[in-house]
Amino acid sequence: MKNSAPACDIPDLGPDVYAQWRASGIGATTERLEGRLILELVGDVSGCRVLDVGCGDGRLALELSRRGAIVTGIDASAPMIDAAKRRAQQHNANVTFQVAVAEHLPFPAEQFDIVTAITILCFVQDAAPVFREIERVLRPGGRLIIGELGKWSAWAAGRRIRAWLGSRLWRRGWFRTAKELRGLAERAGLVVKGVRGAVYYPRWGLAARLISPFDPALGRFTMIGAGFVALSAVKPAAGP
């Protein structure tokens, strides 16, 4: 990808890493909170054509399909797409998966009612082309739900430390504030409807257990310390 680090080029990231993360206590809690927020923002998807950009191993795509959406998932990583296809087969889900990059979506204009993009921009230095492509494939009135790693949180600080210590994964990481995400969406021609936060605890199991019950309430009132930032936006309807 131009100006980016495709997931397939990063040896630290793959289906097994995702599975290990979800199997941990803090990973399961974090996935639950992030997933609940994204699904709340996505809302009713019954009959909608949905594109999941950076679908990973297909977990969100399959949940959207289960809720009645017609789902296509793309990812830059062939191993991730293979894992997503296996997951779909295991669950007898009718979801289309293919290898593609977010900067060059292989779809006609105005193809989708909803686009989801979860934690992909953290591996993209120049995110503007991604937003432009998403705007292009959305139909007028279509919606974008994007979730990203927060820039100012205990989690982000830990990732920066790991980058300084030599992590190949986080040395290529790019974190953005809610304001920066809002600006990218608006410059692409989208109208931002809201920004919410999640994951207000540090990467420590006890803290997660103590704070996670209050996480949804915190996400409605402040972005300070959010480890996960979710933005919803809409493509303006065509004029008369």
Residue ranges and their predicted role:
Residues 1-45, 59, 63, 83, 143-168, ...:
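Conserved class I S-adenosyl-L-methionine
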Residues 51, 57-104:
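Class I SAM-dependent methyltransferase SAM/SAH-binding core
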Residues 116:
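A conserved beta-strand element that flanks and buttresses the S-adenosyl-L-methionine
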Residues 119-122:
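Short catalytic micro-motifs in class I SAM-dependent methyltransferases
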Residues 128-140:
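A short glycine-rich, Lys/Arg-flanked "PGG" loop and its adjoining helix->strand segment in the class I
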Residues 163-180:
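Acceptor-substrate binding/catalytic loop of class I
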Residues 193-240:
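A C-terminal cap/extension of S-adenosyl-L-methionine-dependent methyltransferases
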